[in-house]
Amino acid sequence: MSTSLVSKPSASKAVVVFSGGQDSTTCLIQALTQYDEVHGITFDYGQRHREEIEVAKSLAKRLKITSHKVMDVTLLNELAISALTRDAIPVSHELMENGLPNTFVPGRNILFLTLAGIYAYQLGAEAIITGVCETDFSGYPDCRNDFVKAMESALVQGMDKQLKIITPLMWLNKAQTWALADKYQQLDLVRHHTLTCYNGVIGDGCGDCPACHLRKRGLDDYLQDKTTVMASLDASEPNA
């Protein structure tokens, strides 16, 4: 009888930047089917809709992910003035003089992906997953594919480690994002238990802020023609 040891394949691991909103929750649900270990990281930056932190904690437990870390990055609140970091600044539907919405938080995704990269290095994870999207994005420059690729390159070079930033929603519209949740039989969970609203209202939200408008329009488009939207999602499967 052989006494040689058979090495066990190392577990595949991913870190999901997890806010508790529709997009990141959908990415988390998908990741649970693709990786042995899924670790969520949520950032407390003193955000206007900070109820999302408790939502993220609740969903992490409900979905039974491997671990969930909430990281204090409230320094960002001091540096970045935005409607999402200042309660006194109302969320506007109009763009600012620089062409960006007043909900844009300068440097937010730069900081989040940097810290997620450090955490992935610590865990030995090969992937960071984030729910940013260029197709239906809200005008944020740090949601663009070019930005994500630049961040990935910086992390790989700066830590001398192979690490991928995966963006499952990058080329999906909101209707297709709803379809992706439905594909994993989690449409109701994402619809009723996530928080996307800038005013901190769970589920369907306040119905007035830009995030709620985008979310509702996508849901309506999906529910009106599920078959067509699901087919378009399947056709884009390499990106989903």
Swiss-Prot record:
Pathway: Purine metabolism; 7-cyano-7-deazaguanine biosynthesis
A GO BP entry: queuosine biosynthetic process
Source organism superkingdom: Bacteria
InterPro entries cross-referenced by the UniProt entry: QueC (IPR018317), Rossmann-like_a/b/a_fold (IPR014729)
Keyword Nucleotide-binding in annotation: yes
Role: Catalyzes the ATP-dependent conversion of 7-carboxy-7-deazaguanine (CDG) to 7-cyano-7-deazaguanine (preQ(0)).
Protein name: 7-cyano-7-deazaguanine synthase
